[in-house]
């Protein structure tokens, strides 16, 4: 779960945006500037990232769900891969307004998606006309693109992990309304407001995004492993107690 300063430097996490595009609220996390580009202070980023990883691990250990959100071209694939590796839901296409605050409606769309997949798999569409089958294929493709990553989400998540807060303001606003903790990478051109676990860093470099997402996914897997170990230990202790009580003097 550990991340080093060297890894962050090699991934270019310290490169911010042009100095003319900046949020004064990010000033505490800026080291200086070079060639009109803000340089992020990784001595501040590293402990903050580690705090985010600890929180992530704790949520996973409590069998919680963390929703990965990254819809920018350069982060989309990374977010989907790392979320899938950690066994968590993700949104890598456009964020649909109300995904969190109107989850009941979204749940209806998720049911439709699953029903359509089952029907297609069962060969039900073969009985339809060519036009009807094509329409269903198009509808299914749209649903899979928009909701495929959250297909198995049964309720609102316990936390969300966001890459690029400016790109996902609606997601953060919805999470804030519902009291869902937000873990997010925040670059120098955006405000960290509404983020509970701030990771000040470059949100444009693919290498940097891989580092963040990989770290979060690893923390989740470690948390899950701890949870399983605790259950096994509890079961073992219970069996030992049962044997002890069942002994006949």
Curated annotation (Swiss-Prot):
One of its GO terms (molecular function) is structural constituent of ribosome. CDD domains: RPS2. GO terms for cellular component: cytosolic small ribosomal subunit. Disulfide bonds: none annotated. Keywords: Ribonucleoprotein, Ribosomal protein. GO terms for biological process: translation. The keyword Thylakoid does not apply. InterPro entries: Ribosomal_uS2, Ribosomal_uS2_bac/mit/plastid, Ribosomal_uS2_flav_dom_sf. The keyword Ribonucleoprotein applies. SUPFAM superfamilies: Ribosomal protein S2. It holds the Pfam family Ribosomal_S2. Belongs to the universal ribosomal protein uS2 family. NCBIfam families: rpsB_bact (TIGR01011). This is Small ribosomal subunit protein uS2.
